[in-house]
Design a protein with these regions (language model features):
Chain B
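Interhelical loop and adjacent transmembrane-helix boundary motif
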Residues: 225-274
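Membrane-interfacial helix termini and adjacent extracytoplasmic/periplasmic loops
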Residues: 35-54, 114-159
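Transmembrane alpha-helical segments of polytopic membrane transport and secretion proteins
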Residues: 1-12, 284-294
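Periplasmic/extracellular loop-to-transmembrane helix junction in inner-membrane transport proteins
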Residues: 1-6, 28-70, 90-91, 143, ...
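Transmembrane alpha-helices
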Residues: 100-103, 107, 111, 165-169, ...
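N-terminal signal-anchor transmembrane alpha helix
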Residues: 11-28
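Alpha-helical transmembrane segments in multi-pass membrane proteins
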Residues: 61-66, 70, 74, 82, ...
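Transmembrane-helix boundary motif in ABC transporter permease subunits
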Residues: 70-101, 114, 132, 284-289
Length: 394, 294, 277
């Protein structure tokens, strides 16, 4: 049979048809992949960055999935990603746990954004609210749109006697964190009951008026579809969704609507930021002073490990992070994110320079970090945390 | 044994090894979550990855309710459509119509999901919900909806599986010997009566096999469902609420699982799904085997 | 004459049957129509020649996904064609009794696996070692394709008339030569048709790819790199909040439908020419 095969022309044709492409596909240069996960807040901007970055650096592939800031932090804590996105800085306890396992985690501000308070009242186009009224709406204290406290802030506006449907995020969200951080600043009761958090449950007073959505996109959709609802979304989602935004009373007493200018104002007041190798859990720029400042503003961060396992990934990360802090910023405003002020960019760049590789090890495969302990666990061996299972023994 | 036989035997054995490896590794990886929750995992009602609490019931329920209602619709529609093709449509059109029905099966499910997002979800939200609001005291039809719901999943599933059972029933009806039907006509039966008295009993087994196969397809369907069902792990009676199925949650959460237990739980759900499909498909084969002899 | 209950039920069932048929056909027509109407907008040269571009512009195309699909399907065929062919050959020509029964059951088991589970298998075997890659995706699709290839090969070889086989034997040709040249030669068109239909079946599979190839924006050149694929990019774009990507999703869907249709109709036509169908 072998002799026949070797003599047959068709056989050789088939062989070439199958093996030549295979050889080409195996020997071609392999791309370096950076995988990130986390906040949906900056997702449209990151998508745009990836497209342009890819055009410039063809051998580095960046993948980012918008799963929410909470999921991003969890991914960083279990080392299943190369970088994560979060609107909320890591909690002190989370940061210290990661520091113990992997070394310092840098918070690199990639952009900033505003959280717009959006509403859907068919009869009303413009709405003023103050921080404490907003807090009371979310605490369930204010039930109807024509509540005297809302009316007094909006003289002449015909507010209807309708129940307020209050929308929040269902998933663990940095956008929620920024929003509740603001509410904690403007309402003592909010600060003492719910505080600043990535996820909270509606107080009982909300009753059946509470709705939840997944991701910024989910909340935007609900506001679009349910009349007399109020919610909070990252500013770009409000504009894209054609949602009406609330003019919020800022620290100076003016009613300000979110816009590129009013959001960017807040960055001027980010006076001191911690060293990259420390925890950033106290960083907040909500309710900043200034006549024209929008009150609900925050940086959004890329979380990345200082100590990298693989030199290739380390170099690729540096290239990516440098690019988004410099060339990437030119795309921000077109997508309705204010570009970062230069001093913030410098802080980020200095952190990027400090990324370094652990000497010796070739590199972990983060998928191995889950399946390998899973295999051990299934045959009864205690599973250990990921940083230990691969890195230190090699 | 000649060289060809040994070569093909080699490949067959390789295949057997691969499949066994497959099944073995799935079971192995699902052990940790069963160790932690025991058999209660299957009936656990809470699925909270952030707290490492896992229970399969929301997905078992979602898969069950969507597939079952879909197959009920499919059975009713299939019989009618097959009857139409075989008995009512002009014979020349028959082949064309069958091809058209089979065309639906060839549409990739992600495309049906795409259509589902932009047409079925708004249909449920803006048409079916208002239409059924006088009936909203029935638990199945209660509640508000964004359109992403069990109902939307049922609609796309019905659309996807009905052609399968229709084809089976149609083929079975076509294979009923003409003499038997003519004998019935000669005795004065109406077209429907011929169907009811002659064709239906004879084709019962083949039809059943087709129905079960269609049900198996519904149980395992991933993409079209995950795009319209709302992806919320709760157990609700209302079809307008969002839900979750076994296949959908695995597709959604697998890449973002951040703990060993989470992946184990997802693979365990995969085992449940696999066993479910296996039972269904084996049933269909057993029934079909009887048909060949009988 | 007064219409009897019997003729009324007959008419009622006829009406019901027409209604049922319409319920089945009308959504199908709506799907096809909406794919065409929505997809024609971006069915242009840019769609198939350009990788994704800025969201502020036209959004670019899906070249990365087209190449990715080609790579993934190639690997899937590389795995499933030899394996499926020889298993089908074995079942049709050589297998006996219990082993044959066992093998056939195994093929049925494989055929009934929900595609997402094939993806999980590929993840635990390939992704864990080589990372997210076109190889992993191709492996998953290959697993899905094997039963289709095996069954159609077995059926094709089973359709060879005994006279042809016997003629070969009577000429003194060895067994394996009869099988390889005469049987396979006779059934060649059907076997190739089976290959093509398996290909058409897996080219639209999405679920296993979701968890094996990662779906980025890069144009893959190496099977160990992550990749994207046409059905996967449809999924990603459909779920995104960007209208530009929604349009591309519809056009990609139209493209995929055209490919699947061409293969299916092509196979039927091919079989008709060979005077088999």
């Amino acid at each position: 049979m072998l002799r026949f095969m070797l003599k047959n022309r068709k056989f050789w044709l088939l062989l070439i048809l199958f093996t030549v492409p295979l050889i080409l596909m195996v020997s071609a240069p392999q791309a370096i992949t950076l995988v990130g996960q986390g906040a949906t807040f900056p997702e449209p901007l990151i998508m745009e960055w990836i497209i342009h970055f890819q055009e410039r650096y063809r051998n580095i592939t960046v993948i980012y999935k918008g799963t929410g800031s909470g999921a991003g932090v969890k991914a960083i804590l279990s080392r299943t990603v190369d970088f994560a996105g979060s609107d909320a800085p890591m909690k002190l306890s989370e940061w210290e746990e990661a520091n113990r396992k992997f070394g310092p985690i840098f918070h690199i501000p990639e952009t900033m954004g505003g959280v717009a308070v959006v509403f859907n009242i068919p009869e009303v186009e413009e709405l003023n609210l103050s921080g404490d009224v907003l807090a009371d709406i979310y605490l369930g204290r204010i039930e109807y749109w024509d509540d005297p406290r809302i009316v007094s802030l909006n003289p002449g506006v015909g507010l209807p006697h309708e129940r307020i449907y209050v929308v929040k995020r269902a998933d663990s969200s940095g956008t929620t964190y920024i929003f509740t951080d603001y509410l904690s600043h403007v309402s003592a009761e909010w600060a003492s009951t719910i505080g600043k958090t990535k996820t909270f449950s509606f107080p009982d007073a909300i009753g059946d008026r509470g709705l939840t959505g997944y991701g910024n996109a989910g909340v935007a959709q609900i506001i679009q579809q349910i009349p007399y609802s109020i919610g909070y979304v990252e500013f770009a989602y409000a504009v894209k969704g054609g949602l009406k935004t609330v003019a919020l009373r800022n620290k100076a007493g003016n009613f300000v609507k979110p816009s590129l200018e009013t959001i960017a104002e807040a960055a001027k007041y980010a006076l001191s930021l911690p060293d990259p190798e420390e925890s950033w859990h106290n960083v907040s720029i909500v309710n900043s002073p200034g006549e024209n400042t929008y009150p609900i503003v925050s940086f959004t961060y890329i979380l990345v490990y200082k100590y990298q396992d693989s030199p290739k990934i380390c170099a690729a990360l540096k290239t990516w992070l440098r690019w988004i802090l410099t060339e990437g910023q030119q795309y921000s405003e077109r997508l309705l994110y204010p570009s970062l002020p230069q001093n913030i960019v410098e802080i980020g760049l200095s952190a990027v320079e400090r990324l370094q590789t652990n000497t010796g090890s070739e590199g972990y495969k983060f998928q191995l970090c889950l399946i390998f302990p899973l295999l051990l666990a299934s045959i009864g061996i205690e599973n250990r945390s990921c940083g230990e299972c691969i890195g230190e023994d090699n | 044994m000649d060289p060809l036989e040994s070569l093909s035997l080699f490949f067959s054995v390789m295949l057997i090894i691969v499949v066994l490896l497959f099944m073995g590794s799935m079971v192995l990886y699902s052990l940790p979550v069963f160790e932690k929750f025991g058999i209660k995992f299957i009936v656990g009602t809470e699925w909270n990855p952030r707290k490492d609490i896992f229970g399969a019931l929301p997905f078992v329920w979602g898969t069950f309710i969507t597939s079952t209602i879909a197959i009920v619709f499919a059975i009713v529609i299939s019989y009618g459509a097959a009857y139409f093709i075989v008995e009512i449509a002009p014979p020349k059109l028959r082949e064309f119509l069958s091809s058209v029905i089979e065309l639906i099966v060839a549409i990739p499910s992600v495309i049906i999901g795409l259509w589902g997002i932009f047409y079925v979800v708004p249909l449920v939200r803006d048409f079916l919900k208002p239409l059924s609001s006088p009936l909203s005291f029935i638990p199945f039809l209660s509640g508000e909806t964004s359109g992403y719901s069990l109902m939307a999943a049922i609609i796309v599933l019905t659309l996807m599986i009905t052609p399968i059972s229709t084809s089976f029933i149609k083929n079975a009806l076509e294979s009923v010997p003409m003499e038997l039907k003519e004998a019935a006509y000669a005795l004065g039966a109406t077209r429907y009566e011929v169907f009811k008295i002659v064709s239906k009993p004879l084709t019962r087994r083949a039809a059943l096999a087709g129905i079960i196969l269609a049900y198996g397809r519904a149980v395992g369907e991933t993409m079209a469902v995950v795009m319209v069902v709302g992806n919320t792990p709760n157990i609700s009676l209302s079809l307008f609420n969002p839900g979750y199925t076994l296949a959908a949650v695995i597709a959604n959460e697998f890449l973002e699982a951040t703990s060993v237990l989470h992946i184990s739980a997802l693979i365990a759900l995969g085992v449940i799904l696999f066993v479910w499909s296996l039972v269904v498909n084996t049933l269909a084969i057993l029934i079909m085997k009887r048909v060949r002899i009988g | 004459m007064r219409p009897s209950l019997r003729s009324l039920t007959d008419k009622f069932y006829t009406a019901f049957a027409i209604f049922a048929f319409l319920i089945l056909i009308i959504p199908l027509l709506h799907i096809i129509l909406s794919i065409i109407m929505n997809g024609i907008k971006r069915l242009d040269l840019e769609l198939i020649t350009s990788p994704p571009k800025s969201l502020l512009g036209s959004g670019g195309g899906i070249l990365h996904a087209i190449i990715g699909t080609a790579m993934v399907v190639f690997i899937a065929m590389l795995i499933s064609l030899p394996l499926g062919f020889f298993v089908g050959l074995y079942l049709a020509e050589f297998a006996k009794g219990k082993f044959a029964h066992f093998l056939r059951t195994l093929i049925s088991v494989l055929a009934g696996i929900p595609s997402i589970i094939a993806g999980v298998f590929a993840y635990t075997v390939i992704v864990v070692v080589y990372g997210f890659s076109a190889l992993a995706g191709g492996f998953a699709l290959g697993i899905i394709a094997i039963p289709y290839v095996a069954r159609s090969t077995e059926e094709a070889l089973g359709s060879v008339p005994m006279e042809i086989k016997e003629a070969g034997f009577s000429l003194g040709i060895e067994r394996w030569k009869v099988v390889l040249f005469i049987d396979v030669g006779y059934a060649k068109s059907r076997i190739i048709a089976g290959f093509l239909l398996a290909l058409a079946r897996v080219i639209g599979e999405t679920a296993p790819l979701l968890i094996t190839i990662l779906g980025g924006i890069n144009i893959p050149s190496n099977i160990f790199s992550p990749a994207n694929a046409i059905p996967l990019v449809i999924y990603q774009y459909a779920l995104s909040p960007f209208r530009i990507w929604h349009n591309i999703a519809w056009s990609a869907a139209l493209l995929l439908m055209i490919i699947v249709l061409v293969i299916n109709l092509g196979v039927r036509y091919y079989l008709k020419i060979k005077a088999i169908y």
